[in-house]
Amino acid sequence: MTKDIAQVMAEVGRKAKAAAAPLSIATSEQKNKALNAAADAILEARADILEANRLDLANAEKNGMAASFVDRLTLNEARIDAIAEDIRAIATLPDPVGEVIAEWDRPNGLHIERVRTPLGVIGVIYESRPNVTADAGALCLKAGNAVILRGGSDSAHSSAAIHKALVKGLEAANLPADAIQIVPVTDRAAVGEMLKGLGGAIDVIVPRGGKSLVARVQSEARVPVFAHLEGICHLYIDKSADLDMARRIALDAKMRRTGICGAAETLLVDRAVASTHLAPILGDLAAGGCEIRGSAEVLALYPAAKPATEEDWSTEYLDAIISVALVDGISGAIDHINRYSSHHTEAIVAEDAQTVARFFNEIDSAILLHNASTQFADGGEFGMGAEIGIATGKMHARGPVGVEQLTSFKYRVRGSGQVRG
């Protein structure tokens, strides 16, 4: 790490801290004006953004990056339209800042209110997905937070072009341009500086990316982190489940999009209905192109499966692969999930109310679903608008991190001359 990088990042932190103060008291109208103007600017800069993206794609091709990586990096007309639409959607969300969460009166006449406030300065560290530049910038702005964006170097040109449009939005609403900054250097030492907190400037870090990035952030950060390391999500089929429903949900939970953190990675089936339910469900998955890895009991009932190893139960595949085991009812499912889960998302298919109640009460994961696909683990599906990520920690934010989760709170206490005496 060079002294220059430390100095550059310290200046970024100072600017963000200075911008956070006026942004925290900006009106809803100002913030929405900035967001809509940013969406307009992105559409107006379409040609520039596509040209910048072509430079990033050329570098990716030269470096032999995988097809899935190139797809995440690629922007086109439709994706730029979607970025602008997402920003406009964030503008339509209720402004959380200033919301009175709770209020009560004390016997001495004091009136107490708990009120939402911005967090301050948020650092977002992400890999080469240019749309995150827009999503994170817009969400933080809506919640009244300044943000420092550090995207992957592979998307540097694309992110810079999008950032330019976001700044135009801020300027159109007379908000500080430094409220949304992009790290001006690609040196990885800049990430290390952010994880130290930039001298107290950063209030929280949000990593968006693969396991290695998130693990580094969680181990090195000296400020709070909103993140999940893995999405080892389970789907349990109870003996009381409707088979047709179970088949639909299992296929969607695994195969709708295999590479997202809400995709099911392990299927658990109640041993009591294995003889009737297992083969149809696994047949659907196999027909959809999914590789089945099963326990010895599963192999006996479904010989087309491959043997599962101990490692499979704690693996996030992010691919068309699923591990399958039989369990002794809800108790067995709870034991397995609490042992192997990453505490992201779990789902149960069941009709018995007591079984569902145990699932909800005894499993400690951020998102629990009944008779619905794990792929609903998404801020947009929760009605939160876009999300900046999903958190599995227990402090402050848990589950989808949307605008509301990017706030803290303070207490306002109104009196009429009371003294404690």
Curated annotation (Swiss-Prot):
Matches recorded under InterPro entries: Ald_DH/histidinol_DH, Ald_DH_C, Ald_DH_N, Aldehyde_DH_dom, G-glutamylP_reductase_CS, Glu-5-SA_DH, GPR_dom
One GO CC term on file: cytoplasm
UniProt keyword Cytoplasm, yes or no: yes
Major enzyme class: oxidoreductase
Reactions accelerated catalytically: L-glutamate 5-semialdehyde + phosphate + NADP(+) = L-glutamyl 5-phosphate + NADPH + H(+)
Chief localization: cytoplasm
EC number: 1.2.1.41
Known pathway: Amino-acid biosynthesis; L-proline biosynthesis; L-glutamate 5-semialdehyde from L-glutamate: step 2/2
Keywords for the protein's UniProt record, in alphabetical order: Amino-acid biosynthesis, Cytoplasm, NADP, Oxidoreductase, Proline biosynthesis
Gene Ontology molecular functions: glutamate-5-semialdehyde dehydrogenase activity; NADP binding
Superkingdom, taxonomy of origin: Bacteria
Compartment annotation: Cytoplasm
Example GO biological process: L-proline biosynthetic process
PANTHER family named among the record's database cross-references: DELTA-1-PYRROLINE-5-CARBOXYLATE SYNTHASE, GLUTAMATE SEMIALDEHYDE DEHYDROGENASE
Task of the protein: Catalyzes the NADPH-dependent reduction of L-glutamate 5-phosphate into L-glutamate 5-semialdehyde and phosphate. The product spontaneously undergoes cyclization to form 1-pyrroline-5-carboxylate.
NCBIfam families (UniProt xref): PRK00197.1 (NF001221), proA (TIGR00407)
Family named by the database record: Belongs to the gamma-glutamyl phosphate reductase family.
Name recorded for this polypeptide: Gamma-glutamyl phosphate reductase
